[in-house]
């Protein structure tokens, strides 16, 4: 398991995911701040398998130019959890179209 945390660890959900990943012997990558391009780069660089986002992060990822969105290999991703706020249906549908059926709602 390779978990990418784009959210601050003073929130309980990312902190819990980081702790669980470490507990099972996985690798954790923690972003200092969320940057959509850097986020995609890190997924590819570290073959990230698990991540957790908020709907605003989805929106920022979807606003990237197509060339940036398709430049990175995201095939390692197995589970992407979104939480903390309701996700607009259109945003979630666009993310599923892009990443496939790996998006899980935790709200």
Task: Tell where the protein language model's regions lie, with residue ranges.
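Glycine-rich, N-terminal phosphate-binding loop of Rossmann-like dinucleotide-binding domains
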Residues: 7, 13, 55
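Conserved AMP-binding/adenylation subdomain of ANL enzymes
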Residues: 1-2, 10-49, 64
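Hydrophobic alpha-helical segments typical of transmembrane helices
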Residues: 5, 17, 38-39, 57, ...
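Short beta->alpha linker loops
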Residues: 34-35, 56, 86
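Nucleotide donor/acceptor-binding cores
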Residues: 1, 7, 78
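Thr-Gly-centered strand-to-loop micro-motif
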Residues: 5-6, 30, 81-83
């Amino acid at each position: 398991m390779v978990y990418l945390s784009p959210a601050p660890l003073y929130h309980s959900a990312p902190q819990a995911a980081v702790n669980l990943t470490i507990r099972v012997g996985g690798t954790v990558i923690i972003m200092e701040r969320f940057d959509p391009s850097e986020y995609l780069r890190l997924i590819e660089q570290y073959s990230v398998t698990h991540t957790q986002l908020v709907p605003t992060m989805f929106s920022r990822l979807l606003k990237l130019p197509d060339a940036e969105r398709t430049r990175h290999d995201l095939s390692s991703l197995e589970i992407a959890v979104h939480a903390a706020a309701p996700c607009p249906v259109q945003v979630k549908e666009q993310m599923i179209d892009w990443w496939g059926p790996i998006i899980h709602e935790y709200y």
